[in-house]
Amino acid sequence: MSRPRRPGPEGRQPTIKQVAERAGVSPMTVSRTLAGGSGVRPEVQQRVLEAVQKLGYHRNENARSLRPGHRSGLIGVAITNLANPYYGTFALGVEEVAATYGRRIILGNTGEDADRETQLVADFIGRQIEGLIIVPSASSADHLGPDRIGGLPAVLASRRVYGLELDTVVLDDVGGAYRGTRHLIESGHRRIGYLGNVLSVFTGQRRFSGYERALTEQGLAVHPELVQRGQQDVESAGAALARLLDSDDPPTAIFSANNRNTIGALSEIGRRIRGGTDPSRLPALVGFDDFELADLSPVPLAVIAHDPHQLGAEAARLLFHRMESTDPVPARTIELPVTLRIIRP
């Protein structure tokens, strides 16, 4: 049986003609805009894209190649950072489970950008994916609501979106950050800095909560000047640590909320050691997420370890369970455990 078309906000799939009418342009202009915008003025492109979003229109890229009664065999996987090896391992976990069900994955990168994520999901749906696994870039996501994706089975991985009844796989973010920060406190540190995501990101909020809880339980203040948020890559994380270390009263230890921040911090520490700084004068680190070459750290280091392959595999299993269910099943949330791995005391 062929898959039903995804409904738009009014309960049916809008046509390219309806998009053109709403934008006040020709159907050809809509097609050219969606194909990259060559020869279309920017203000016209903006009107077309607004109409596309308002109507919930999706290009059906596979319509000509799919024969009636045939499935695409595709699972869309949207991640936030293709440059992060963590997500390569995550995607491998998804792919291996998908292969056992005779499906293939198509992978897309959102760059932690909500608009880019919205377009990526629309592109996936246009390719007639059978299911979606997504690491959401924001705590709100209207483009994942039932009026936008219809009955498409979808699973959220690593992060929850409040208000959406979708199957979700997350990590013990709060507990992991708490244990990591407690480890630093028990090692004698009192001024502990923080590198992580903004609070609007689900994991950013949860991991900061664990850090904050560990400090307050021990009667230690959370100093705003020791908190650096919003770093998305190694370079910006290194710069964030440099700001902390160059302050009048620098931290003696750092809790880092993800591997990009940890690697960036270690890069800055290495730069200072090469410049002649004694390693004993540099901060100890605990980082959320294990990573390759962690054992080469020149300063005390521990990581909150978990398996991104398992995270991807669990998300895929939830998705295929949802796809194969013949009766309505309430949305499930699975929280995977994490462990503290002390690499260099």
Q: Where are the model-predicted features located?
A:
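Short beta->alpha connector loops
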Residues: G111-A114, V135-S140, R260
